[in-house]
Amino acid sequence: DDATEAILFYLESLKRPSKFFKIARRVTRKKPVILLKGGSTADGASAAVSHTASLGSDDRILDGAVRQSGIVRIHEFSHLVLAAKAIAPMPLPAGNKVGFVSPSGAFAVHLSDLCRERTCLIFPPLSERTLKRIRSICPPFINIANPVDIFPAVTVQGTEIAYREAIAALLEDPGIDAVVAVMILTEELTPDSYDFIVDLAARHWNKPVYISFSGDSACNAVAKAFLEPRGVPTFPLIEDPFKVLDILVRCRAAMKRS
């Protein structure tokens, strides 16, 4: 189906594995295929038998066949939903190089550790042009790197200008494949409009832009209600955009191998 751009599914057993993987190898050349497999443990397999009366394959054998066919396997149900949410409005990332706009140094450290230890993502050095643009909105004593700690710029420029300039600079950097911004939203820090995020995402349509929030739940809900209908996915936990990007980067790599 040419109108189907990605396939995400849950599976407990395979009755015709040869046919399944033959089709999978053909499909994964053109579009991402993401699998959540149930019954991978003895307890899970027993539960699968009890409600489907079917037997699953040996999980290690299945895992190897899945990788060889170009399917990307995940292990959390929430990731299936979040990956679908990210794929629907945004392109796949071209690679694993992420530009991150962080609202604090603590978030930057925590998420750098997460990406290094649990994903294939990297935060590459920024180009001199990108650094110069971001420095122009920051107090002079601030050291700029990737991840970008944007809070000092927010204190002098306000939320909208600081995030707009930082996100735009990262999207224009040829060494960046995707941009994640985490925003701390309160009544004092909420921008007048989120149009700038929608506009930047549309202008740089070939790079995904993901937004996550930390702060007042009512302010977060307003931002989500504005951004998502306009094609910018948002994520409830600050770790989620990076976990999703890891999945989608693996999808891109699998498509290239296929």
Predicted regions and their residues:
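Catalytic-core regions of core metabolic enzymes
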Residues: D1-S258
